[in-house]
Amino acid sequence: FLSAIASMLGKFL
């Protein structure tokens, strides 16, 4: 779950 959020954040940034 956390990894998914980090991945989404990285993609957004």
Curated annotation (Swiss-Prot):
User: Which GO terms of type biological process are on file?
Assistant: defense response to bacterium
Q: Where in the cell is it found?
A: Secreted
Q: Which UniProt keywords apply?
A: Amphibian defense peptide, Antibiotic, Antimicrobial, Secreted
| Name of this protein | Ranatuerin-7
What tissues is it present in?
Answer: Expressed by the skin glands.
Q: What does this protein do?
A: Antibacterial activity against Gram-positive bacterium S.aureus (MIC=200 uM). Shows no detectable hemolytic activity towards human erythrocytes.
Q: What is the lineage of its organism?
A: Eukaryota, Metazoa, Chordata, Craniata, Vertebrata
Instruction: Report the source organism.
Output: Aquarana catesbeiana (American bullfrog)
According to its UniProt record, which protein family does this protein belong to? Answer: Belongs to the frog skin active peptide (FSAP) family. Temporin subfamily.
Its primary localisation, in coarse terms, equals secreted
Entry's Gene Ontology cellular component terms: extracellular region
